[in-house]
Structures are given as structure tokens and as C-alpha cells.
């Protein structure tokens, strides 16, 4: 996601730092034909989310499910491809519609 939930101020600040660094670095290296982008996953089935109450959290997600690592990997692969060679400084949310 783009920010943490209530009680996660430190997590939100870290995310904001990554977003700012992504945009600044993208401008710094663009003339060298280097792209810099970030991916902001929402709730994804991983070890990090395995202990969460998925039933409760799914009700918050407009697509009513957790994402998969493969869905995130597909975006990363696209951003690393020639098809994304004119995309830089962007943060792509992979979140099922839940903007947190």
C-alpha cells in the first residue's frame, strides 16, 4: 500500500520515504535511460500475512480477496520490460482497490 493503517506511523513514514526517493531518483537517472519505479502491494498471500485474519480483512478490500505473489511479480516483470521503457517515477499499487 501507499501508507500504513492507524497505529503504523513509522511504517507510513518509511513508505513515504521510498515513494519520494523513487520519484527523485527517477529524475536523476532518466537522462541515462534508466527507469526507477516502485510497486506498492496491498494484502498479498505471503508469510507476512499468514497470521492475519483474512476473512475480516477481505471485507475491507473491494475485490474481496488477497492478492498473490504472482500478481505482484507480473507488474515487476512488466516494469523491467521494454514495454515500460517510458514509465519512470511511478508507484504502481497492486491492492485489489484498497488504498491504504
Locate predicted features:
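Short, flexible catalytic-loop segment of classical short-chain dehydrogenase/reductase
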Residues: 2, 19, 36-51
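Active-site "substrate specificity/gating" loop of NAD(P)-dependent dehydrogenases
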Residues: 2-8, 30-31
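NAD(P)H cofactor-binding loop motif with strongest signal on the N-terminal glycine-rich segment
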Residues: 9, 17
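Active-site helix of classical SDR
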Residues: 14, 22
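Alpha-helical segment proximal to the catalytic Tyr-Lys
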Residues: 27-31, 85
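Rossmann-like NAD(H)/NADP(H) cofactor-binding core
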Residues: 32, 37, 90
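Catalytic Tyr-x(3-8)-Lys segment
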Residues: 53-71
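C-terminal substrate-recognition "lid" of short-chain dehydrogenase/reductases
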Residues: 66-99
